[in-house]
Amino acid sequence: VLRLAVVGIDGSGKSTTTLRVLQVLCRYRTVIKPGRPNLVGDQGRLSPYWEPAGTFFELLFRNVDHTRQRLLIGWTRILFVTYAAFMERWMVRRFKPEVVLTSRCPILDPAIYQEVYYPGLSRRMTLQRRMEMTRLLTRVPPRTGYFFLRTPIPVAMDRILRRIERLYPTSLMHREYWLHLHENPHALQIIAQRFDRALSLARTQYGSGIMEIDTTTRNEEEAAGIITDTIGKLPMEFSEPLLVKV
């Protein structure tokens, strides 16, 4: 199984890019996407799987995020990571896919975002140790490869704010009300730096391949095209710690 992840800071277009890749990839490979939402693709058809869980987490995150309480928000993310890891293991057994593609990494992302939501704990543990702890807790294998959407902070913030205006056009609340706690330039800068380090560790520790895609001027459609073409050329036994920048 090729286990691949599209990663990047908030505002990089991970979710939209991943969805567009899946829509094309399912035409010639069996693919699953565990998470929010769970998706199964085969023979050109992409279908949701166990939708109530996705709805539950959407409502949970929306309500908890508005409390602005770091520990409470952090615990909901731990719950989701545990759930997503379980779904990956279950869906791999159930559907026997050729490709597992996620819009976050169940190992890297929790280790990185701990620094925002649990700064005290993060100061006592290196990023490498946090990654290894997350890998052991989730019980999912390291990713075969990563597609890192490199996005400048101003571009990411602009996309985040435009997303909020699109999702909540009639809201009486100020747009900052809808921002996640880490959706600010300072936090995003820290997250971006940690991704660089985490991906480097993934190459050396897990042998993961990395493709870095500059999304400064590329939209989600263009990034998805690059990713889809690359996956289509990967042999099922691919396992090389390559680093490619486009």
Write out the residue ranges for each language-model feature.
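Conserved lysine of the Walker
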Residues: 14
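Hydrophobic positions on the alpha1 helix immediately C-terminal to the Walker A/P-loop
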Residues: 17
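NTP-dependent small-molecule kinase module
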Residues: 158-246
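ATP-dependent small-molecule kinase phosphotransfer cores
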Residues: 39-127
